[in-house]
UniProtKB/Swiss-Prot annotation:
Keyword match Cell membrane: yes
Compartment annotation: Cell inner membrane
Membrane topology of the entry: Multi-pass membrane protein
Upper taxonomic lineage: Bacteria, Pseudomonadati, Pseudomonadota, Gammaproteobacteria, Pasteurellales
Job description of the protein: Probably involved in the transfer of electrons from the quinone pool to the type-c cytochromes.
A Pfam family hit: NrfD
UniProt entry keywords in alphabetical sequence: Cell inner membrane, Cell membrane, Membrane, Transmembrane, Transmembrane helix
Transmembrane segments: 20-40, 58-78, 98-118, 153-173, 185-205, 224-244, 259-279, 293-313
Subcellular location, principal: membrane
GO cellular component, as recorded: plasma membrane
Protein name as annotated: Protein NrfD homolog
Keyword Nucleotide-binding appears in the UniProt entry: no
Residue ranges the record marks as coiled coil: none
Family from the record: Belongs to the NrfD family.
Source organism (scientific name): Haemophilus influenzae (strain ATCC 51907 / DSM 11121 / KW20 / Rd)
């Protein structure tokens, strides 16, 4: 049955609300930023890792959004004070529980990677404030010897985390639009895009790097391919719904009409994909590597990914099987 009334944020079939949408958005940023930072580190011979802003961004964006996302997830529980049960009592038939385990392993490897990168800074702090913790430096020394395989595993975990955000929604089998095999790949691509955009904002605003810096040139290599991939996956997503027939076709109609249709066409497609894509493909290099221009395009990219998360979550729950 098609909908003939506006239900932007309220529907009888709503199970997950805006908290989950923000949670998915934050995890995507974490996934993309960490993958980018590791790719940059392994592609360049860097003498002082802790002073490089792409590496710094990877550590910051890898950890902070994930911790904020987990906090949101905890307060989304019916009984938040029982969160420790979710953290340490795994249910292998629960996608959410498996996700929590993934986050814990991901954060463990991220911490190992981060302390190796900031080894000198940690040592200086220990010597100055807590000399009794000198044994920590021995542990970091051990971690330093295995940092290469740790990086490889962390990169894989970051990619799995990005795809997991799609698996989480596709597990809702009673919703035809969400029960879609394209979602994990789409969320991985869009999450990587948001991680790139967030990294750009940090290196240009906090790091005060120039728009034509080596770091900016490196990041630009990935922008267009990822956005084209994201656009292609969105097309595949909707084509699958269209030819799926039955409630899948109804779900497509409901999603692309009304309030959430506007969110998709304007927020996701125009602001989030077409404008950044055109800006990267057709403007001259002087504008393309302009600091303010990159910041503006990155903000558009983040808005688009944010809208995509809300669109998929809310529009996907408009129609049941």
């Amino acid at each position: 049955m098609t909908l003939d009334y506006p239900v932007p944020f309220h529907t009888p079939n709503l199970v997950w609300d805006y908290t989950i949408a923000i949670y998915l958005f934050l995890l995507g940023i974490s996934s993309g930023a960490v993958q980018l930072a590791i790719a940059y580190k392994r592609s360049n011979k860097l003498e002082n890792l802790s002073q490089n802003w792409i590496i710094r961004s990877g550590v910051i964006l890898g950890s902070v959004p994930t911790l904020i996302g987990l906090t949101l997830l905890i307060f989304h529980l019916t009984r938040p004070w029982t969160f420790w049960k979710l953290m340490f009592n795994y249910q292998f038939n629960s996608v959410m529980s498996m996700g929590v385990m993934l986050f814990q392993i991901y954060m463990l490897f991220l911490v190992i990677w981060g302390v190796v990168i900031f080894k000198k800074e940690i040592e200086a702090l220990i010597n100055r404030f807590i000399p009794k913790l000198q044994f920590v430096m021995k542990l970091i020394g051990i971690a330093e010897r295995i940092v290469s395989p740790v990086e490889v595993i962390l990169f894989i975990l970051a990619a799995v985390l990005g795809a997991y955000t799609g698996f989480l929604l596709s597990a809702l089998i009673s919703y035809p639009m969400l029960n879609n095999p394209v979602l994990p790949a789409l969320f991985l691509a869009s999450g990587t895009s948001s991680g790139i955009a967030a990294t750009f904002l940090i290196i240009l605003i906090a790091g005060k790097l120039k728009g034509d810096s080596h770091e900016s040139h490196f990041i630009h290599k990935f922008e267009v391919p990822i956005m084209v991939t994201e656009l292609g996956l969105i097309v595949c997503f909707f084509v699958g719904l269209h030819f799926g027939g039955g409630q899948k076709t109804v779900a497509l109609h409901n999603a692309l009409s009304g309030f959430w249709g506007v969110v998709f066409w304007v927020g996701v497609l125009i602001i989030g994909i077409l404008i950044p894509l055109i800006a990267n493909m057709f403007v001259n290099d002087r504008l393309k590597y302009n600091r303010n221009f990159i910041i503006l395009v990155s903000i558009f990219d983040l808005i688009g990914v944010f809208c995509l998360r809300f669109f998929i979550l809310y529009a996907g729950q408009l129609t049941v099987a």
